[in-house]
Structures are given as structure tokens and as C-alpha cells.
Amino acid sequence: PLILSRSESYIGTLVDDLVIKGTNEPYRMMTSRSEYRLLLRQDNADSRLTPLGHRVGLIDDARFKEFEAKQARISAEKTRLEQTVLSPAKANAFLEGIGETPLKSGASLADLLRRPAISYAQLAEIDENRPFLTVSEQLTVESDIKYAGYAARQIGEVKRHIKLEENKLPAYIDYKGIKGLRIEAAQKLDKIRPLTIGQASAISGVNPADISVLLIYLGLH
């Protein structure tokens, strides 16, 4: 079966919320429900889901080759922006013209793009060797560079969650008898009966301290 995780799609978030957290009222899927929404951007939906679609036969080889070519163009452009360094003499007139702080030393095009007020489109004025990219590809290049640090932290959180998913919770656990586990957490865990530590960590009312108690109880801490 094809199982989409919380870090791969909003439908994965929706299913996980309904199965693990439950709901007493109509459920509305909003971006705020995802802790990984920086990874679940509109502009990178194809990079997240096309490989999965190809794997299960929903995407044919011709379309997948087009996808790979697009990803190669995006990757090459990000590399070019990182490696293209401009001197203050080259960049400062442009920066001052848009009200940005001028450079004191050389900076790459990627460094300039990381400034909140500068867009990829604006950089065309001082970027003579820019290749042709579609609007969609330009948006992905800009988003990937601007939010790289934040995305890296979220990817770290995803890896941590995957590791927690490997820790299974026995079905027979008496949560109310675990010393150090808060009453609210014990009640929620007893009612929902998560299958893994990862699922337990996603339950509203179960905090990181409760997860630490569970790991100690299981001898995994």
C-alpha cells in the first residue's frame, strides 16, 4: 500500500490526525495543522509526490523523465547562485536602488536572495548569465534558498520522528501505572492506545516530558 506520512503530504496529516488524535467536530484541513508545513509547500508538491506516483505506476516514464529534467535545472540553478559572487562595485548600485544595505565585501547571488526583501526576479538586473526557468521553477529556487535553514531543521525533526516510530508500544501497557507520567497524558494514551512512540508524541496532551517517561519505562532512554 501507499502510505503518505505527515512530512510528505497534507492528506497524510489529515489521516494521521483523524486516526491518532480523533475529533469531536467536523475536521477542516488547514496548513496550520501541519508541523512540517515549510516542507509541504505548493511549489514543491511535485518533488514530494511525483517519485511516489512513479513508484506505484501513477506516473509514466515519459512524465517522470520530464520531472527529473526539471529537478536537474532547479539544482543547477541553486548551485550557480551559490557560486556566483558579486563585488560591491557590481551589486551596490542595485542594492541602494531598492533600499537595501550595500555590500562591504563580495557576496554570492544566493546570499543576496536570502535577504527577505529581494526576490529572484529582482536579481535579474545584476545577473547576466541567468538561464531560462519557468515561473514555477523560479519559485522553487527562491523558496529553497530563502528557507534552507528552516527546512533543514524540519528535516531533522522528521528524522527524529521516524526514529520514534521505530519504537513500538506494547498493547498491554498500563499507562496509569507508569510512575512519572502525568494524569492527562496517561488518560489520553490509555484511550487512544498508540502503536508507537511516534504516534504517542503526536497526541494532544502528551508532551516531550511524557515521551521521555515512556522511553525510560521501555528501557530505550
Regions found by a protein language model. Name each.
Residues 17, 26-28, 54-56, 60:
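Phosphate/diphosphate-binding loops
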